[in-house]
């Protein structure tokens, strides 16, 4: 499908065949009124995976449904849930069975409310979120049968106030965890502990609910769901929904000479290529949806596409629009209707709309930059051909090592199962606050500790020593006057979060983790919040406040950070010939020293500005590898070349780890040195950016052969001469991307991998 004159940008083209549906009958146990409501909306039968998941939930088995986009996952849990609600009612409609629905975003919970309301059933549905009034909350507690909320409200409101919710919690029959693949990293660890607290509080009120999890396709769904809930979970993962033929294209923008640091080439911006592709497709009357990472990017792509279309045919000049969060429901519905009717032929949308967007009949999807996981990639591509027709999916690579690797190694994207979620619910920095919250909800008993994992007893001792909990008789009690739930911000990596304040109004726009504020919310930073672009004026670390205002800036910023590291404890290691790979606990010292401004259109570096921010210390997990002097001698690398070779290997390995650990490159960091004092050898570290670790470095250790092999291949295959952002240059390097030795990095990694064996089957 390459446009005329640009076939050289297509790195891979693959055709996936169509798949027919496998149907199943409605179960006899289903409430006839619920079945009739679905039949009235054209659903005459189920797909096989819907029936299997619904039957498992009805039988009281905890189940995870892990299937593709548009495979009808909501019906699979709504059928048993709504049936239980209706058949469990007492006299005069008294609540007999309750359902709790958890979504990662408020918007998705509201979309779920709309979907249930459209069935026209007499089920009492309510949302419980930060916008709910006191009167609404009281009605929800006393009357609602199907409560839609999010993990944040469960943690801060419902669980601490569980005694006020006793009648509802005592009636709870089902807990639905939607979009479960989004719970990863530190957020996933927090949610895992919140769900354990929920199970404990439900038992206190006499309920033992069945958990039903819905997820995009992912590896080992029963393992991930079990780690999230602490329960034994049955997986339904065979997708029986129909799929049309899908053409997939991996697209790489061309290099532009001399626009980067030290004269390095940079690639044309993915957003510019995306606008060109939308134009090409719309001219051919192909209905197209483009996923773009930010609202600013969405608006830019839509505007540029219309400009290009106007040059081709003035009648096409307004056939592309933008679709992003923040629109009113009626605006969203109007845009959806315009796309369905054909008035609009193209739309640019933020990645967040992979959750809950209701647009069918699309012919093509263009993804501007790899969305971070194979699960998200397939979910976005799945938006095309949703009615079962044939479709086109295009991934446009951004200028970084991960995107570069994927378009040159298509099997890594298209030939592997999607990732399992990575998170560590036993992280003591996460577990501690939740043990405190649990003790305030109800004093902790010794026989309850296994619920919270193998480190609970150890962490409890630390909490007692810190004076936060007190052991009396056979239980642990919360001793502080504060609300224990306030100790944990479940979307934060640790420490008091920094509030983001709009300077002109004083309005709180959001928060950012204390750990990331230095690098993302410093003075002069361009900050993207829910897709909107803001310019930070000041960062006050004492008051934990960053003041910023909306911006139309045409540049982006990236912080430069200096890092040092020491090994606290080596937990595990493996010999790779004479080299070694290790995993353990480290102490990382970091200081943001400056930031770069880059053109948003071209990626060209505009300037660098120094910053005066304090050093931070972080105890976290890391993976590291060492190469002894005798092996280095055989590589032929001169001593003066070793720092640049190690530095280049470190940068690219950080860029590639997200392919194996479902993280963002900003969630991790690294250090490299030709001689580290703790090992006495050349050492390269990659560490988690969160206190206590988030599981990313450990995943790197477990998949090191594949991860570091991909690192080596990315550097070797890049067409630049000395290094560029697609291979070894890092946007956050505190040393100004010096020294870097591209050829030396390949030789160094060859020496390491020559002795390597797989660390995980």
Residues of each region from the PLM?
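Helicase motor core with emphasis on the C-terminal RecA-like subdomain
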Residues: 2-41, 45-48, 52-151, 155, ...
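Short Gly/Ser/Thr- and Asp/Glu-enriched loop/turn motifs at secondary-structure junctions
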Residues: 51-52, 541, 722
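Extended Lys/Arg-rich polyanion-binding regions
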Residues: 390-393, 399-417, 424, 429-446, ...
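Juxtamembrane regulatory segments of integral membrane proteins
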Residues: 726, 735-736
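Cys/His-rich metal-chelating microdomains
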Residues: 730
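Acidic, low-complexity intrinsically disordered tails
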Residues: 751-761
